[in-house]
Amino acid sequence: MSEEMMQTSPFECPAWFDGKKINETVFCEEFLRDYPMVTVNDAFFTVNGRVHDENRLKKVIYDRIKYYVTSGVAKKVTNLLDVMRMECCTAKLSLYQDRIHVANGTYYLNGTFSPEKDFCRNRLPVAYNPDAPQPVTWLHFLSQLLEPEDILTLQEFMGYCFIPSTKGQKMLLLIGKGGEGKSRIGIVLRALLGSNMNTGSIAKVETSPFARADLEHELVMLDDDMKLEALPQTNNIKAIITAELPMDLEKKGQQSYQGDLYVRFIGLGNGVLQSLYDRSVGFFRRQIILSTKEKDPNRKDDPY
């Protein structure tokens, strides 16, 4: 949400206020003209991707109506947000696998770039720079962490995570003994993906009925400290990794619904992912396992 949206001033009686009450439909139509949005499965999206913090939307609405509503303000703000959710509802927001939505426009996988922005589910917080210098520090770090062929695999998988696709049908596991610096991968991914990445537990995906809904509209789910306990089942993980059709999602206290999942799993830990009962090829073929190098005893870590 831009700072512009956080400012409003009462100069004259707006069209949506008749002196006694607010016309909710007219208010929402005006609001959406100023700040275009659409909703998919009750989630708001702008040209900058998903609106993760609806409290900021409520603050903008509050700033507009606070001069005209003197009681029950919080309830009125919530009601207006719900009406707006219906007003801009769309059946589907297309997922494009031939482009990456970046902060300064759209980068197409054929190598072209456009500064134009369209409504999208995910926009990365980083800008495309065709003249960016070689990431020397990053490459040096990777050379200490992984073998050359594994570096290529890691970078290819990270690129795969930038588009909403599950065609790779793989998850990535980075395994080490500890202290190698593999958790830095998560820090870099957070900088690249921003709020389009969810951090949590892969095991929770199998044990919580609400975990799948938390992954809707996310590009990556990172588990930076995988549990060594074997998974009681693997159905959900396998289904999500290869998902091509809408899946049944459930939020607490709400009726389940069909939603698209294109999240990719990345796990960091001291051991591989295990299952109590699943010994099938289907479980293990979905995993790309990279083992880190032994930590150089002469390496001096930068605490900053």
Model regions: which residues?
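Phosphate-sensing "switch" segment of ASCE/P-loop ATPases
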Residues: 258-262, 279-304
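A short, contiguous, amphipathic alpha-helix enriched in charged residues
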Residues: 20-26, 190-194, 230-247
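Substrate-gripping "pore-loop 1 plus following alpha2 helix"
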Residues: 199-207, 234-256, 301-304
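AAA+/SF3 P-loop NTPase mechanochemical coupling elements
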Residues: 210-217, 249-269
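Conserved AAA+/SF3 P-loop NTPase catalytic/coupling segment centered on the Walker-B
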Residues: 218-242, 257-263, 275-283
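Long, basic/Gly/Ser/Thr-rich N-terminal segments
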Residues: 39-42, 46-111
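Conserved nucleotide-binding/hydrolysis micro-motifs of P-loop NTPases
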Residues: 227-228, 270-275, 293-298
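P-loop NTPase catalytic core of nucleic-acid-dependent motor ATPases
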Residues: 2-5, 32-50, 55-56, 100-219, ...
